[in-house]
Amino acid sequence: MREAIKCISEYVQCPISMAAQCVIGAISHIAQRNVNAPHPYVKDGEPCSLFLLSEGQSGSRKSSAKTIADHSIKEYERLQYDRYRRNDRQWQKKFLGNEKKEHKSCLAETKEPKDPSSVFSDITIESLLGLYIDGFVTNVSISSDEAAQFFAGHTMKSETRNQALATFTKLFDDGYVERTRSKSNLNGSGRAYDVRLTFNLQGQREVLIKALQDPVLRGQGFLARFILTVPENLAGQRFQDKEHQSKDINTDSRMIIYWERCSDLLNDSSDHQRYVIPLDEEAKKVDLAFYNEIESLQAKGKCYEYLQAFASRASQLARRLATVFTYFQGEAFINKQILLAACDVIRFSLNEWLRYTEIELDKESDAEKLIKNLKLKNGSKK
């Protein structure tokens, strides 16, 4: 996985952190189907699904990096959808070929095929709830290199935004959704347990900065669940030579190994319930130390004093990320090295969030200065 990240960054000429987010988003989508992260108090663990957010200007190569990281998932989705279309055509032919009175028995004998699509770039909360509750999907990714589709979309602009945010946080925490409707409503009531959602969003600062400083999105804890990266813009430094142009990422062993591993995990047809990947004894020590480290930095006067909603989730996010890494590597336990790497990613993310908090505080300070100046001017005129 580490080599695949380096490979993407090298060929695409994008920052390592951007390539890493793309790969993490892909393997979170794959891992959430089969494993749970360890939880301090819950025997069955918690979802290992991750919420990821990357800022990148137009031309930062974020789309190219994401396309490469998602290659195996897209191929898998395409093959599954082609199979569904074939089965659906056969089913429709059989169903419509029967007399109307035989439709009920036909439905009992052969169920209508379900669209297996599980990766969406743009989907409303109502549509998503419907897919979960009706049993069409259990594992979904909202994945887009145009974050505006989500943050400026219907769900985040509608009157029910707060309800949608509560649903997303419940999905993240418990893998559970519910919908309560009147009997006359076509979109009926229902619940879905053990469902999963990964967010992998990328966008430009002009789009993201409004969302990331939105007091509702921050206050409800929605954004606090995201791992954020705001990489340096490499424009003006991405020079190429003949050697670079002659290389082919499709024949690079680093990518082939990564893509094959993704495909193997996606095609794993083992019929089993999700299982928890536990921490080994050394990893437990790392988990404890990391928790106490971040807790101490939330004290008054410390760097995360005004970032407590985000910092308080650091240990949880590190365990989830380590679970995803461990599953991808085929290990039975989360070891010390894997958890240390996950902790480094979460520290990096917290510092990225801190930068946005500082931008907001600077704006408030400027506003306060303006008010003071106006008051002074008005006072001098009297």
Residues covered by each model-derived region:
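Phosphate-handling catalytic cores of nucleic-acid transaction enzymes
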Residues: 1-382
